[in-house]
Amino acid sequence: MNLEKINELTAQDMAGVNATILEQLNSDVQLINQLGYYIVSGGGKRIRPMIAVLAARAVGYQGSAHVTIAALIEFIHTATLLHDDVVDESDMRRGKATANAAFGNAASVLVGDFIYTRAFQMMTQLGSLKILEVMSEAVNVIAEGEVLQLMNVNDPDITEENYMRVIYSKTARLFEAAAQCSGILAGCTPEEEKG
C-alpha cells in the first residue's frame, strides 16, 4: 500500500486530528496561538498521528478517542521539534524559518512546554491510566534521546549502538507509543499492544 492510498484511507480521521490540533492549541495568550499555529502549519506528513489512526483501524477500534491520541502524539512531536531546533541552533525547517528563528529561543521553549502540557491534559481527559503511563514513559525516553544526542554531537567515535539508541529514543519510541495507545483504546492484550 502506498502513501496516497493510506492518505485516502485515513482522510476523515486525519481531518479530525487536524481540527483537534487547532482547537487544542487555542490559548488566551496570543503568542502561544501565533507560534503554535506557525509550527503546526509548517508542513509535515503527520506520519506519527497517522500510525495511531492506522493502528486503531487495524485492531477494529470503533470509538473516536483515537483522534485525540493521534493529535496528542503530534503535539509531543511538535514540542520536541521546538526544543530540538533551539538546542541545535537551527534556523530552517522544511524550507521555512524555524519558530526559534522567527519568534526567539525563549518563546519557542515556552510554547514547546505549553504544547507538552496540553498533550498531557488531553491524555488525562481520555481517562486511561495505561495510556498516561505509556506516553509518560515515551516522553521520558525522547528526552533522554535528546540528551544523548547532545552528549554525542561532536563525537566522531560514536558507536553504532549509541547512534541507534539515539534514533530509537528520539524517533522510534513515539511511533511505538502511537500504535500501542490505539491498541489500549481497543482493549487489546498487552502482547497485542506491543505486537
Language-model segments: residues:
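N-terminal amphipathic/basic leader segments beginning at the initiator methionine
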Residues: M1-L22
